[in-house]
Every structure is written in structure tokens, then in C-alpha cells.
Amino acid sequence: MPFNIDINGHLLHYATVQPLYILKNKVPTYVFLSHPATASELVFSAGQLKKVMMDGRPVKNTGDKYLLKCGQEKEHLIVLSAVNGRQTKILLLTQEQARRSWKIQKGNEDLLCITSSQVIPSSEEITVRNVDRNQFEMQIYPADSRWKVREGISVKKRKQGEFQVIRFEVPAVPLQVSCRKEQNPDSYVPQQPVYPEDNRLKETPESCPGPQYFVNFKPVPSSLYYAVSVPQLPVSVKNAYLMIDYTGDTGALYNKGALIADDYYWGGPMMFDTGRMKRQGSQEYLLQIIPFAPEVNIYLDPSVRKKLELSSQGVRSIRIAPVYDVKFDRPAG
């Protein structure tokens, strides 16, 4: 990528790496990512540079330039030392690291977190969240051993290069959901409409693709029905997702006769956030699956269409995926 860009007073003539973030700390860090199919190179003007280090080793200038060649399989740290003593850091990430990276602010410091978990920062703490996975790993730059994990067990911390690596887990919470075929869907029709009546589909023939369900439950010929019961969540789990693996044109989920979620088949599970409902004990739902017509005249990704079996439509499996939240912080100073 030919460009002339100022990096804290140093001229970057060109680079084959992609800019990501600037961590505006006392010693700023410019974060870039390497592309797997491209040799990673950066060329700096030597004008204001006294010394360049890459991964702890000095780099020699070539005339009036510094040429840095970096492998794409690991991260690299480049330290630029100016003639006036000012330092600038460049952190080069792999593509996978960049994909899982988060820039967050803690106090007056910018941090880089690399994790497959969701990161929810606040001024007081950082929350990391996993769905259906009770094991966590965080890589934090700059490295700092003072990070403390709340509620975590089996906490292991170590320094790896420029990162502080923290691994921990929380107790797994097994949750069982019951699902049975419903032979009498008429019993789920609400006595009074919960929502204004939806008659858009009144004249739609069953052979047409697309949704054939309603905001207020009404049985639809050829549909498959399942009674689903979700248990009360324990105190340690604040939320959970209902994961419905099915085959069919559409899926529709009802609670007390009202449509609460729908899904067009795409090859993956239908997900429903149970936290959307007021939880007072267990929850009962009716799941409606409308099968595909014999001719599926809609676009599906080739990999999905290849696996589509019209002879076995309906629910394949249904489970509860708990949401695990863990908070961790670092003492000030």
C-alpha cells in the first residue's frame, strides 16, 4: 500500500499492512494487521530516527530508509526511537488476532484486548461474555499482571510477548429444555387477539414461499408444531438463548398466542434471547415450522442447499445456551 503517513513524527513511506487502531498512551502504539497472502513490509524515513528495534533486535537502516520485513504468522513489536528521545511503538497483529481484537479505554489508558469473547467495557470494570462456553481467554496489551478476575476459577496468568494472557473459567451450568410434538395446536389460539389482526396473508396460497404465519397464532395447514418448555434459570445465569436446529421454510415462536420470534431457514440454528421475556419460573412456547414446498424456489447458499433434506423437515434438536458474564478489573495507579 503506497502511502506517506505520519507516525508520531516519523514518515512511513509505504506499507503492505493495514492500519487498525492508535492507542494514545504516554508512549503511543500504532496497531496494524498483516494480510496472510502478502509479505508484510514497512519502510520508514531515517530522517528523525535514532534507532529502530523489532522484536527486541536492532534494525539497520539502508541509506535514508529503514526497511522492516515481518512474518505474518505471529505478532511483532517495533519500537521507533527518535533523535529527541521520544519513543513510538508499532504493534503488528496477525489477521486472526485482528479479527478478535477490541480497543477499550480504562481510565486514561487505551488498551488492546484480543479474545473470542464479547467485551463490554465500562469506566469501572471490563465484562467479558461467552454464550454456551464457560472457558475464557484474554490477551491484553500493554501487559500488566495486576488484572484481577472476579468470580473466575482456575485463573492462570502469564506474560506472552507484549501481552498479558489471562485464562479462566466459571462453573458450567447444564440446562435441560423439553420439546415434544404438539398434536392439538388449536388449543394455543388466543381467545382474544394479543396484537391487531394481521390479514396480509389471507389470500396467499400455501405453495408460495415465505412466511405463512401470523402475529396472533393461527394453525396453518401442513405446519409442524412443537411444545417447548424452558426451565427457570439459576441465579448464577443472567440470561440464555434458545437454540433451535430445524429444517423448514420458516420457524415461528409463540408465547401465550403472540408471535415473539421468527426465522427464515439459512442452515444455522434459530436463536431466541429468553431475556426478552419476563422470567417468573419456567417458560412455555409453541414452535411452528412451515415446511418447504416440493420445489424450493428461493436462494440458499450452495453449501446449505447441498445439505437440505426435504424428507426430514422439522426440529432436529433444541437446547439452551447459557450466557456467562465475568467481570475483571485492575487497581488504579
Language-model-detected regions and their locations in the chain:
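Non-catalytic C-terminal accessory domains or segments of carbohydrate-active enzymes
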Residues: 1-333
